[in-house]
Amino acid sequence: MEFFNGAILLSPSDLNAFLECEHLTQLDLAVARHERERPAAENPQAELVRRKGDEHEAAYLAELIAKGRDVVTIHNDWDLGLAARATEEAMLAGADVIYQACFVDEDWRGFADFVERQPDGRYEVVDTKLARHSKPAYVLQLCFYSE
């Protein structure tokens, strides 16, 4: 959840958080409005899972590059508008793979791990997760990016 062009933009993670706990959404909104600080809770287990997830994602990216795929990287530290335009330009140019594709649509924004061009020219979202089984939150996230 963040402000962009004077409005709140939500992400698939925000929707999943709301489905889990409405109060968490209120706290996230207060942080987005700069009404409170985000708690700096240290959680070594969560940090380990995040790091392992990043490694898994990096390994998949390296595999795509090793296969000779044309990979365009969208840097998620860019302005959202710039990142969304760069994603659209990469798709229009026919990039094989777009890494960290940025999508912004009205009240929503998100970054897909990978968007891969299919033989028919359409793009398919590919998300890298450490989980062995799909979870509803993952499916919701993929639906958002696929829409």
Model-identified regions with their sequence ranges:
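Metal-dependent nuclease catalytic cores that hydrolyze phosphodiester bonds in DNA/RNA
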Residues: 1-120
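Hydrophobic/aromatic pocket-lining and membrane-interface residues
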Residues: 114-116, 126, 142-145
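Glycine- and acidic
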Residues: 124-132
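Metal-dependent nuclease catalytic cores in nucleic-acid-processing enzymes
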Residues: 132-147
